């Protein structure tokens, strides 16, 4: 979905984290987070992702091991950039109020679908919804293990 829907994965993770921790996540919070972090996502994270993906395609005339070493370095930089974005969102959501909505599969799926739908250039398909529900299930399973 990161590719097919142009999803900002750190934003999706933030939405899921807030929802399962009993915090409000609504269109206003989504919009505020997008406004704050989209320049970082656009100018830092996405260019690193593009370079990593191009290196992965193997279409450059470099030795495979050297190209792979560079790709791994770019991948590490991309992940570091996403962690910085997550920290930005963490700081921005400290004052988010509690939610009355229970963090169950249906509600978490709806929150994640709101994020994906807001970022996608196309309408969400049943396949997208299936993937969103899988992500919601994984988040809830992880939370159950932590409890």
Task: Locate the predicted segments by residue.
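Long hydrophobic alpha-helical segments typical of transmembrane helices together
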Residues: 139-147
